[in-house]
């Protein structure tokens, strides 16, 4: 019989407050606005000799660190074919049709995404967590990860992928 184990972390302090905008399928841009995002993470894998997939005490700070990197920033997608993003010294310029947004560089996180949807933000958070877990816990035997990014109560994007 196969045995499957997982851990889930979903703490109130796994959050980030960020501004963003989406480009809709028809090419329209929604207004710049913000959310107080909440993050949850589930890891599935084999348990180690101590009987754990990964120790909560050492894993939680890693998730918090990933959330903190996005906190109080404007999230800009750099892979959208609809907008143009230019780095100009201490500023980030975003062009959409005839509109121009100019933001201080230190207030922006440029993300290699086509959009800043909760689904793609969940994948980005998962990628960051995966990189850090592999670095800090190289012997962990994790098979898959699921990340949820909630932008409003009961409204969340999910990503699930192999580890």
Task: Show which residues each predicted segment covers.
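Charge-rich, low-complexity N-terminal segments
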Residues: 1-163
């Amino acid at each position: 019989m196969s045995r499957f184990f997982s851990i889930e972390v979903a703490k109130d302090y796994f959050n980030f407050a960020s501004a963003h905008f989406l480009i809709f399928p028809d090419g329209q841009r929604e207004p710049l606005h913000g959310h107080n995002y909440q993050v949850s993470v589930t890891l599935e894998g084999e348990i180690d000799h101590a009987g754990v997939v990964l120790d909560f005490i050492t894993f939680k700070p890693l998730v918090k660190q990933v959330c903190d990197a996005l906190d109080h920033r404007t999230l800009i997608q750099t892979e959208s074919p609809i907008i143009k993003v230019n780095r100009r010294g201490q500023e980030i310029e975003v062009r959409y049709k005839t509109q121009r947004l100019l933001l201080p560089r230190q207030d922006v996180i440029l993300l290699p995404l086509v959009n800043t949807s909760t689904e793609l933000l969940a994948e980005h958070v998962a990628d960051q967590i995966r990189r850090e877990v592999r670095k800090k816990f190289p012997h962990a035997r994790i098979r898959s990860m699921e990340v949820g990014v909630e932008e409003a109560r009961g409204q969340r994007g999910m990503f699930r992928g192999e580890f």
